[in-house]
Amino acid sequence: MVKSHIGSWILVLFVAMWSDVGLCKKRPKPGGGWNTGGSRYPGQGSPGGNRYPPQGGGGWGQPHGGGWGQPHGGGWGQPHGGGWGQPHGGGGWGQGGSHSQWNKPSKPKTNMKHVAGAAAAGAVVGGLGGYMLGSAMSRPLIHFGNDYEDRYYRENMYRYPNQVYYRPVDQYSNQNNFVHDCVNITVKQHTVTTTTKGENFTETDIKIMERVVEQMCITQYQRESQAYYQRGASVILFSPPPVILLISFLIFLIVG
């Protein structure tokens, strides 16, 4: 009778510990759907404009002191005005400006959990603040609601990216935030890289590119979420407390 009561209490303790570890595991919250219609970001400018504006400036390719491919005014990939990674103007990616090496900020500590996730999902891109580059995808088949844009996309889809930049899903509270960030950095990087090669993008290009990249970012989020949960389940299953309790309980049953 005593052994029976002890066995019951051990079983209860085992279940409680297992549940506690599972509840304490940090998981990203599922977000709302993306194809619910309407603007994702109210307060946008021109009709049919961009849904993913960069912070602190005009829309993609807008005439803020210099349009696409212009030599002055801070356009994308330009030699003056503080463009991306440019030697003039300061503020570019990876530029030190007037700061000396003595004032360099300390390097951020590497999160080993993120490194493990990156090894399974994609390579970390240097100089992009921890963003990873996903594997190549087939460009999605999208209907834009009018014949002109549908035809334009079919004829120019090769000009749009087939990989996306993203951060680990556990850094975001929901899918919407992940996709928004993913679209912004992917469109920006692709635009800068392509513009420096001498190819310009029209407003139609940017609009279509955002839609295409949005679908790819949603797919990337789904892949990363599934992989994240699988890694989390493995950690919970083989973490020390549940394993020790399970072994102890089995030994008690065998001996008893």
Curated annotation (Swiss-Prot):
<dbReference type="Pfam" id="PF03991">
    <property type="entry name" value="Prion_octapep"/>
</dbReference>
<feature type="repeat" description="5">
    <location>
        <begin position="87"/>
        <end position="95"/>
    </location>
</feature>
<feature type="binding site">
    <location>
        <position position="65"/>
    </location>
    <ligand>
        <name>Cu(2+) 1</name>
    </ligand>
</feature>
<dbReference type="InterPro" id="IPR020949">
    <property type="entry name" value="Prion_copper_b_octapeptide"/>
</dbReference>
<feature type="repeat" description="1">
    <location>
        <begin position="54"/>
        <end position="62"/>
    </location>
</feature>
<feature type="lipid moiety-binding region" description="GPI-anchor amidated alanine">
    <location>
        <position position="233"/>
    </location>
</feature>
<feature type="glycosylation site" description="N-linked (GlcNAc...) asparagine">
    <location>
        <position position="184"/>
    </location>
</feature>
<feature type="repeat" description="2">
    <location>
        <begin position="63"/>
        <end position="70"/>
    </location>
</feature>
<keyword id="KW-0479">Metal-binding</keyword>
<feature type="repeat" description="3">
    <location>
        <begin position="71"/>
        <end position="78"/>
    </location>
</feature>
<feature type="compositionally biased region" description="Gly residues">
    <location>
        <begin position="55"/>
        <end position="97"/>
    </location>
</feature>
<keyword id="KW-0325">Glycoprotein</keyword>
<dbReference type="Pfam" id="PF11587">
    <property type="entry name" value="Prion_bPrPp"/>
</dbReference>
<dbReference type="InterPro" id="IPR036924">
    <property type="entry name" value="Prion/Doppel_b-ribbon_dom_sf"/>
</dbReference>
<feature type="binding site">
    <location>
        <position position="74"/>
    </location>
    <ligand>
        <name>Cu(2+) 2</name>
    </ligand>
</feature>
<feature type="disulfide bond">
    <location>
        <begin position="182"/>
        <end position="217"/>
    </location>
</feature>
<dbReference type="Pfam" id="PF00377">
    <property type="entry name" value="Prion"/>
</dbReference>
<feature type="binding site">
    <location>
        <position position="80"/>
    </location>
    <ligand>
        <name>Cu(2+) 3</name>
    </ligand>
</feature>
<dbReference type="InterPro" id="IPR025860">
    <property type="entry name" value="Prion_N"/>
</dbReference>
<dbReference type="GO" id="GO:0005507">
    <property type="term" value="F:copper ion binding"/>
</dbReference>
<feature type="signal peptide">
    <location>
        <begin position="1"/>
        <end position="24"/>
    </location>
</feature>
<feature type="region of interest" description="Disordered">
    <location>
        <begin position="28"/>
        <end position="110"/>
    </location>
</feature>
<dbReference type="GO" id="GO:0005886">
    <property type="term" value="C:plasma membrane"/>
</dbReference>
<feature type="binding site">
    <location>
        <position position="73"/>
    </location>
    <ligand>
        <name>Cu(2+) 2</name>
    </ligand>
</feature>
<dbReference type="GO" id="GO:0005794">
    <property type="term" value="C:Golgi apparatus"/>
</dbReference>
<keyword id="KW-0640">Prion</keyword>
<feature type="propeptide" description="Removed in mature form">
    <location>
        <begin position="234"/>
        <end position="256"/>
    </location>
</feature>
<keyword id="KW-0677">Repeat</keyword>
<feature type="binding site">
    <location>
        <position position="82"/>
    </location>
    <ligand>
        <name>Cu(2+) 3</name>
    </ligand>
</feature>
<feature type="binding site">
    <location>
        <position position="66"/>
    </location>
    <ligand>
        <name>Cu(2+) 1</name>
    </ligand>
</feature>
<feature type="region of interest" description="Interaction with GRB2, ERI3 and SYN1">
    <location>
        <begin position="25"/>
        <end position="233"/>
    </location>
</feature>
<comment type="similarity">
    <text>Belongs to the prion family.</text>
</comment>
<feature type="binding site">
    <location>
        <position position="91"/>
    </location>
    <ligand>
        <name>Cu(2+) 4</name>
    </ligand>
</feature>
<keyword id="KW-0732">Signal</keyword>
<dbReference type="InterPro" id="IPR022416">
    <property type="entry name" value="Prion/Doppel_prot_b-ribbon_dom"/>
</dbReference>
<dbReference type="GO" id="GO:0098552">
    <property type="term" value="C:side of membrane"/>
</dbReference>
<comment type="subunit">
    <text>Monomer and homodimer. Has a tendency to aggregate into amyloid fibrils containing a cross-beta spine, formed by a steric zipper of superposed beta-strands. Soluble oligomers may represent an intermediate stage on the path to fibril formation. Copper binding may promote oligomerization. Interacts with GRB2, APP, ERI3/PRNPIP and SYN1. Mislocalized cytosolically exposed PrP interacts with MGRN1; this interaction alters MGRN1 subcellular location and causes lysosomal enlargement. Interacts with KIAA1191.</text>
</comment>
<keyword id="KW-0333">Golgi apparatus</keyword>
<dbReference type="GO" id="GO:0051260">
    <property type="term" value="P:protein homooligomerization"/>
</dbReference>
<keyword id="KW-0336">GPI-anchor</keyword>
<feature type="binding site">
    <location>
        <position position="88"/>
    </location>
    <ligand>
        <name>Cu(2+) 4</name>
    </ligand>
</feature>
<feature type="binding site">
    <location>
        <position position="72"/>
    </location>
    <ligand>
        <name>Cu(2+) 2</name>
    </ligand>
</feature>
